């Protein structure tokens, strides 16, 4: 029998920690994984604090086969996922051409010009690959 993958899920956000936002994303991710014969072995929710995120993600990276991180990709100051990944990879944040193109296309579809906050979303750890996002302004990061 093949070894079961150790899949860990890191949910982020002060709004989730406070209960202002109900975490429906974990259930959706678990259902999609389950439909493919996979299960989550650990799920943790962390507030928008760089040190807490670094600590938890570093631990998961050491112990999991796969880490899925949800949240923290938006344009606000407390969206820290790209910065956390850059620090853990010891890589600088750089303008990612594909992320920038996706962001500009998202703004154009809405008849908006990107503002300074939006432009933050084109900054990814050097060497990162994007996961296209058909709904939002920020891509996922692989």
Predicted features by range, described:
Residues 2-43, 48:
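Glycine-rich phosphate/diphosphate-binding loop of Rossmann-like nucleotide-binding domains
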Residues 14-15, 72-75:
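Short glycine-rich anion-binding loops that position phosphate/pyrophosphate groups of nucleotides
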Residues 20-24, 55, 80:
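Generic recognition of short, well-ordered alpha-helical segments
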Residues 47-58:
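Structural motif
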Residues 52, 79-142:
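Proline/glycine-rich low-complexity loops and linkers
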Residues 64:
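An anion/phosphate-binding loop that grips the pyrophosphate of nucleotide cofactors and donors
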């Amino acid at each position: 029998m093949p070894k079961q993958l150790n899949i860990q899920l890191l949910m982020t956000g002060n709004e989730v920690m406070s209960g202002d936002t109900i975490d429906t994303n974990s259930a959706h991710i678990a259902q999609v994984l389950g439909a493919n014969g996979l299960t989550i072995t650990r799920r943790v929710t962390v507030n928008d604090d760089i040190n807490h995120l670094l600590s938890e993600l570093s631990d998961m990276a050491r112990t999991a086969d796969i880490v899925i991180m949800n949240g923290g990709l938006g344009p606000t100051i407390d969206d820290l996922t790209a910065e956390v990944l850059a620090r853990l990879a010891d890589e600088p944040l750089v303008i990612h051409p594909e992320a920038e193109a996706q962001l500009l296309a998202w703004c154009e579809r809405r008849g908006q010009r990107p503002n300074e906050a939006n432009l933050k979303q084109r900054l990814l750890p050097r060497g990162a690959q994007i996961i296209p996002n058909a709904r939002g302004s920020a891509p996922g990061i692989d």
